[in-house]
A protein has these predicted regions:
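Short beta-strand segments
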Residues: 17-20, 67-69, 131-133, 153, ...
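Active-site diphosphate/adenylate-binding microenvironment
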Residues: 200-285
Length: 301
């Protein structure tokens, strides 16, 4: 169990302990070595030569797009400064929903089967992809054509794992984005961004029409709009698997101080309510909200 816990922390994911059915009924002597607290440097500084290579690609690009993941969650300020300097639209992976506020003008939503049309169109028309803190697994939604790409990640194994990368930056995203901002050219106007924001405005209009649909029976989109009115700025949202994921992702407008918890690609149905309970234990002074369908709710009751 101790090894599983260490592995989960080191790999930033789920560790599973599998036991034979009859083992848990047996009595054994406790011969397990006591765990030793260990520490290792958590901040990896990128190589400056890689930063310079990335700067050249960014300055040359006419149609850049950025895809961010949870590896950028501690670099919110640096991310915002970079994209506003370079005028780059940002797409987020589903677990990274609150890294950039949903109402930031350059945020165009998430990518994938339940992503926005704007994100997919922008991704396919881009001439440069910048991936930050993500090992995005759904490669069918990445650019179909062979474009230039930059990837920032603390784990060198993730560099080029999903997409052909021209410049890999192994390092902390907070440091890397700050260094990129200090070295890139300031962009006053980017036609590609303007075109993207025009598409985003159309998408947002569609979403508003859904949320204002007063037909009966009550539409889930309208329910999400009502819930959104009562969500506090630092609330924790625990979204379950299924259509509840679609509703909460598309129709909840969240900010950088919110937490958005999902099962992601694990698809663990029934995670919504336990996630909200755990959130209230971890953050007793914060609002915790579970978004779950009837099936997911019944699975844990």
């Amino acid at each position: 169990v101790n090894e599983a816990i260490r592995t989960a922390y080191e790999q930033k994911g789920v560790a599973v302990v599998i036991c034979p059915n009859d083992l848990l009924t047996e009595k054994i002597k406790d011969t397990t070595n006591k765990p030793v607290d260990t520490s290792r440097p958590t901040v990896v500084s990128p190589k400056y030569k890689d930063i310079k290579k990335a700067v050249k690609l960014i300055n040359k690009s006419k149609k850049p797009v950025m895809l961010i993941g949870v590896g950028a969650k501690h670099a919110k300020d640096e991310l915002r400064e970079f994209i506003e300097m370079a005028k780059i639209p940002v797409i987020h992976s589903l677990p990274a929903k609150t890294i950039l506020p949903d109402d930031h003008p350059y945020s165009i939503g998430n990518l994938g089967k339940i992503g926005t049309k704007t994100s997919y169109q922008t991704m396919q028309e881009a001439d440069l992809l910048i991936m930050v803190g993500t090992n995005y697994p759904y490669v069918d939604y990445l650019p179909k054509k062979n474009i230039k790409a930059i990837q920032i990640d603390t784990n060198p194994k993730n560099i080029g794992h999903r997409f052909n990368i021209n410049v890999g930056i192994v390092g902390d995203s907070k440091i890397a984005l700050h260094q990129l901002t200090e070295n890139i050219k300031h962009v006053a106007e980017r036609p590609f961004l303007n075109k993207t924001l025009e598409r985003k405005a159309v998408w947002d209009k569609w979403m508003e029409q859904d949320k204002n649909n007063n037909s009966k029976p009550l539409r889930p989109e309208r329910l999400m709009a009502s819930i959104n009115k009562f969500i506090k700025d630092d609330a924790v949202i625990s979204a379950d698997v299924g259509t509840a994921t679609v509703w909460s992702t598309r129709y909840l407008n969240l900010g950088v101080n919110n937490k958005f918890i999902i099962s992601s690609w694990l698809g663990t149905m029934g995670c919504g309510l336990p996630g909200a309970i755990a959130s209230k234990i971890a953050y007793p002074n914060r609002q915790a909200i579970a978004i779950a369908g009837d099936g997911a709710f019944q699975m844990v009751m």
